[in-house]
Amino acid sequence: MSDTPTIREMHGLSDKPRTFDQVAITVADPDTIRSWSFGEVVNPETINYRTFKPEKGGLFCERIFGPTRDMECACGKYKRIKHKGITCDRCGVEVTNARVRRERMGHIELAVPVSHIWFYKCMPSRIGLMLDMTARHLERVIYYEDYIVVDPGSTPLEKGAILTEEEFRNAEDEYGYDSFEAGMGAEAIQKMLAAIDLPTLVADLQEQLDNTNSKQNKRKIAKRLKLAQGFLQSNTRPEWMILNVLPVIPPDLRPLVPLEGGRFATSDLNDLYRRVINRNNRLKTLLSLKTPEVIIRNEKRMLQEAVDALFDNGRHGRAVTGAGNRPLKSLSDMLKGKGGRFRQNLLGKRVDYSGRSVIVIGPELKLNQCGLPKKMALILFEPFIIHRLKELGYVHTVRSAKKLIDRKTPEVWDILEEVTKGHPVMLNRAPTLHRLSIQAFEPVLIEGSAIRLHPLVCNAYNADFDGDQMAVHVPLSVEAQMEARQLMLAPNNIFSPASGKPIATPTQDIILGAYFLTHTRAAEVQNNQDNHHHLPLFESIDEVEYAIAARKIGYHDWIRLHNPDYGKKPSEVVYGDVTKKVIITTAGRVRFNEIWPRELGYINRNVGKKQMGDIIWRCYQTVGKERTVQTLDALKNLGFKEATRSGCSIGIVDMVVPSQKKTEIEKAYAELDKVTRQYKNGIITDGERYQKVVDIWTQTTDVIQAALYRKLEHNEGSKMASPLFMMVDSGARGNKAQIKQLSGMRGLMAKPSGEIIERPITANFREGLSVLEYFISTHGARKGLADTALKTADSGYMTRKLVDVAQDVIVHAEDCGTSNGITVHAIYDGDEEVASLSSRIYGRTSCERIVDPVSGEVIVDINDLINEKQAEQLEKIGIERLKIRSVLTCELKKGCCAKCYGLNLATGQEVKIGEAVGIIAAQSIGEPGTQLTMRTFHVGGTATTAFKQPIVKAKNDGRVIYTEDLRTVENADGNFVVLNKNCSVRIENEQGRELESYQPVIGTILYVPNGGTIKKDETLATWDPYNVPVIAEKGGIVEFKDMIVGITVSKETDRETGASSLVVMEHKQELHPQVVIRDAKTREVLAHHAIPAGANLTVKDGETISAGTMVAKTPRKVAKTKDITGGLPRVAELFEARKPKDACTIARVEGIVRLSSKNTSRGKKVITIETPTGELVDHLVPMNKHVIVHEDDHVHLGDQLTEGPVSPEEILDVCGKERLQEHLVNEVQEVYRLQGVEINDKHVEIIVRQMLRKVVITEPGNTEFLWGDQVDKTTFDRINEQTVAQGGQPAAAKPVLLGITKASLETESFISAASFQDTTRVLTEASTLGKTDTLEGFKENVIMGHLIPAGTGFSRYSKIEVEPAEGAEEIAAASEEEEAAELAEDMLNDTINFDNER
């Protein structure tokens, strides 16, 4: 290829991008600002009102900023490209491209120095820190209100002292006019800053820091020291924070656009610059005229304010407003917020070759296809069509090709078909909550204007067809097309990255069709298994098909079939039964099985939504992706076809009301009467009554729901199932709660506050609601809608914070080589397993070797990726805990390693290097948040409380074992009453293996002694679900102590019942209401029982009681409805590491509790714990807190001592990092589990890891760290290694927990932090510290226009070069020549036109 410059290069349009790998930011000095400038702006005018040409020396001056028209000077003496680079001698304008008006800057020489508002107003004030002045004093000096002593000379005044006008005059009179120097305004501040000697200041501050012990002083000195070091290291001077020269940004970045009607639209910056220039010019004039000081001072202050408004309008004083009282947008506003430069233009750009349209369903499509309207495709694929038209010789120039396309000739349509074949397009649906919201498809051209979407991807997009719109994007380059095809094509995204479960699962109609085919009744199955000899026998599946076609048998008829799996090995099939020669099945199931690969075996069961997900997952594991995708398409066709044939529809007759409803409601009312009588007789309190009422109705509703469901399933004994039952049971549409409301009873409703109204709605929608019932319903319905609107925004914001904090976690290496990990176990809620061990260890790397105790074979070895089989085996042999590798313990300096991360859930393969696991984690956690917010909406606000049964029955036969720390006392009935919590009762078999275990609450009555035997379904324990009791450990005579009516206890008489009871109040005095038990004979004290505030006393003074009697009871917290409304804020609270409102106190040591009755310290109770070594450790507890431990209880490190939520910081402090990590992961997961959302632990672990990546320096040693610095753990380790290697003393630090917002702002990259929040503060800090951004994360690279450093842009792949295909050079050369010819042709035409005009 020749070396002559191409036409593009002559026009200054080079193709070579400028590459750089880091960006630094510092404070600019005046000379640098002048060096950027192409001339001084002295004139406030913009353009001439008559000629519309820029004014000379003004804000749009062509001499300074360059010509307004390409290759043409202002006066018109020089035109054309041949004069390029000449400066016109008449008008002084350089002949060049008009594009330079986007690059060339000007400047304004200020008459007096002016302070930069960011450096003194952004807290902490940088100028204030450098001069050790408060922001208020600084402000008074800068705005010409007070004087500051710059140089005290021989006077006793202090340097930097602030003097009012009066004090300054007095000092002048007293010490003489020239004896000291004081000034006001930015000028004086500049002199002060210029006088600072940075090395000396740094040394002084370092010494002060070493010698002070006060934490507050340390903090302040450390801040100053850090700033001084920043200036020193970045070779900048503090006086540059005061401006002598103001830069003027290029005019095309603050354009002035003519509108019709002779008006102009202008950028606000022009107004702000005009104010500055006007005031500056006026001040210059006044200074040359010997004007009085007062006027000049006022003018200087106005100049300062004008410059402030330009940089950050509204930061100081009232904002400068334009027409209609609208504040003008300053330079800071251009950067900040959603509409600012960072988020609007750098992180989110408009994309060329894209379109959007409404979506409709495309049932005829394959999974890898989408229907694209022809008229959209014509525009989207235009460049490819033009290229092909030229290639085939239909046209020779781009212009004529465009004309041909506009005419839509037949050959254009043919070429369009050819061009789109095999060229994937990307479809995106907003809101893009996770990566599956953008997938690639092969376009199928269709008539009409709507995009057609494959039904199986709707789940991933969360799309429905009620008017949703989607955007189409066309990948242009070959590399982009390859990535779209390899990584983004829909068949490659069958599984959810959040949980690894199939996400391309069928829903609604398809599920209904499959269920219709396979559905049978449980009763029939048993019946036919027993007497099946009368059933028709078929040799093969084809025979069954003939019989169906001939209408000899129907889908739901039972048949016998020769087993297609007979004789295979059990390992060869997943579902089939390999032992039977003949299986009993239905004709519908035979048809359902035709589409599945034979390797799965014969699926002989009811198939609903849940089973379908399982079958697809097994199918993928057995036969691989390609055949699974084909099967999915076959399933879609079968499902739609059979759903149509089933004729399934809902009529009002399908909503049958169960006959038991009436009797159940009557029973409930009878129960209510009993409760009311108990309340009237004073046996229970009002709170208990309310809770019992709520529980009675909850149970009644459940009983009616169960009866209704049974009735629907039975369907009056008809052969066909009820359509309503089919829809719900299959999971196609609706749920049991909705059916309950249709024809059961609506049940309890919630008030807007979340409390439950105790009168339920006994009617259902089939019967219709009364006016009152309808009115009560409106609460819930409205709350649902209001919640949805508010929470969607919250959830989106949380996702944004999560992405920001986790964005730089990328898989950087195969293995970091650590032996550390975390120990996981199954998670139980009460006695129900909510997360099995196998589900938690699947796809993770083991840290242990586990051997089968029977056969001796190694099931899992160290560093093995645990697959499903291994996970199940481990569970089978009774392994309860396993240590696995985790991102939390990964020791890689940057990102994490593949071994610590484990499996990539979306592919089921080991995670690849360069995978952006952090962003996947953030999306996996954020995406359901948005769905959960919608959850309240559908049930219409009926209250669902989690009601725990107060009776525990044994599930197995066995021996009952109490753990050693369980303390009980035998009561009068010979049963055992539990006295403490944090202990358990378990049932073991003869071999001593645990079968089940329960954690009893205080006051639980155990019916079987320790070591006793129990049979299955016998009652083991009962407890009071409404109260927390105080139990007497010893029998004797009751004596009240410190129980003074009106001070520590109140006598409450119930208005309705007249029964009175004593309730302990909260009080300020040093009194401790307690119940003392004395021996009946010797009168000696046997036990003290401190009674918490809010407790009702259940014994009388002087009464004789036996051991195990309840002395007092505190009502448990009243049940509110459980709903993600509590959930989303809870997740946010955990991730933001907020301190909970009334956090509990936790044990700082392990040992035995000693409750000292008299001990109080500053109005707080003292709980003492005696450690095994005999040391006593005091814990202070607020007076009104309910203590939940008792005398002689054994507590472990970190156990709760009082009621309330645990503060995460406290856990970190007391129990260390590992315990906190486990706590956070489990708490977050609990919220999602409650909503039935499955997220893999590893995603939460990544976020928790990011929250704990900083340490705070407690002892700097010989390192460069300062006391109280927060630094990355990796940086800390690196510097310590270097220091130790040089023989120095390493620094000491402790881990610190940051919330996700704080952690995002503390990131190493200032560009990433500035684009997140607090833009001005981040940039101010970065510039004064002279920070360098090494462009390692995502956002920095996107902002800089580079490829992201992950996936195919990862550094180890970016060195690969694409080898050009044969003949590529000729094509390039030819296209260059063609382009040159076209440009020349265009220029020639322009010249002719121009000459004609002349």
Curated annotation (Swiss-Prot):
Top-rank lineage group of the source organism: Bacteria
Residues the entry annotates as binding Mg(2+): D464, D466, D468
Pfam family, one: RNA_pol_Rpb1_5
GO terms for biological process, alphabetical: DNA-templated transcription
Cofactor note: Binds 1 Mg(2+) ion per subunit. Binds 2 Zn(2+) ions per subunit.
CDD domains given in the database record: RNAP_beta'_C, RNAP_beta'_N
GO MF annotations in UniProt: DNA binding; DNA-directed RNA polymerase activity; magnesium ion binding; zinc ion binding
Entry binding sites for Zn(2+) 1: C73, C75, C88, C91
Residues the record lists as binding Zn(2+) 2: C816, C890, C897, C900
A GO cellular component entry from the record: DNA-directed RNA polymerase complex
The family this protein is said to belong to: Belongs to the RNA polymerase beta' chain family.
Subunit structure: The RNAP catalytic core consists of 2 alpha, 1 beta, 1 beta' and 1 omega subunit. When a sigma factor is associated with the core the holoenzyme is formed, which can initiate transcription.
Name assigned to this protein: DNA-directed RNA polymerase subunit beta'
